[in-house]
Regions:
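A short, N-terminal "cap"/entry segment at the start of jelly-roll beta-barrel domains
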Residues: 1-32, 42-43, 113-116
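Short, conserved beta-strand element in jelly-roll/cupin
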Residues: 35, 46-62
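Short histidine-centered beta-strand/loop micro-motifs
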Residues: 21-23, 41-47, 64, 70-71, ...
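Beta-strand-connecting loops/turns
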Residues: 38-39, 83
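Short acidic-glycine-tyrosine-enriched beta hairpin
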Residues: 66-82
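Short beta-strand segments in beta-sandwich/barrel cores
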Residues: 40-42, 58-63, 77-78
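Ligand-binding loop in jelly-roll beta-barrel domains
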Residues: 82-108
Length: 116
């Protein structure tokens, strides 16, 4: 199933995540998400800089530029190039993922996010 079909299917709804934590140390930004229910979609979005997403608990399906990247089971690291739209769907309950952004040299004060 592609991310566009998921976003249009009433069975799959974009939901606010119960827990998001932000930490910044020496220009490294970490955004940690806890996704309590499977089938929850972390909305498609894009950043102007490359980053990695660490799946630390559970499993997700990932998309990049509307094409599936496949299933990732914890522990897993997903590299997201700059300017690539990406999204995640929890395949299990209690997924924990962390996005790590190195902003050194980018001139940004925080990770810029544009949702679609």
């Amino acid at each position: 199933m592609d991310i566009d079909a998921i976003s249009k299917n009433p069975k799959y709804k974009k939901t606010d995540l119960d827990y998001v934590e932000f930490v910044e140390v020496d220009d490294i930004w970490v955004r940690s998400y806890t996704i309590p229910k499977s089938k929850t979609v972390l909305a498609q979005h894009v950043h102007t800089h490359p980053h990695v997403t660490l799946i630390s608990h559970g499993a997700v399906e990932a998309w990049q530029d509307d094409e599936t990247m496949g299933r990732f089971d914890a522990p897993a690291v997903i590299t997201i190039p700059a300017g690539k739209k990406h999204a995640f769907m929890a395949l299990t309950d209690d997924v924990v993922l962390c996005c790590l952004h190195n902003l050194r040299g980018t001139g940004l004060e925080s990770p810029e996010i544009k949702e679609f």
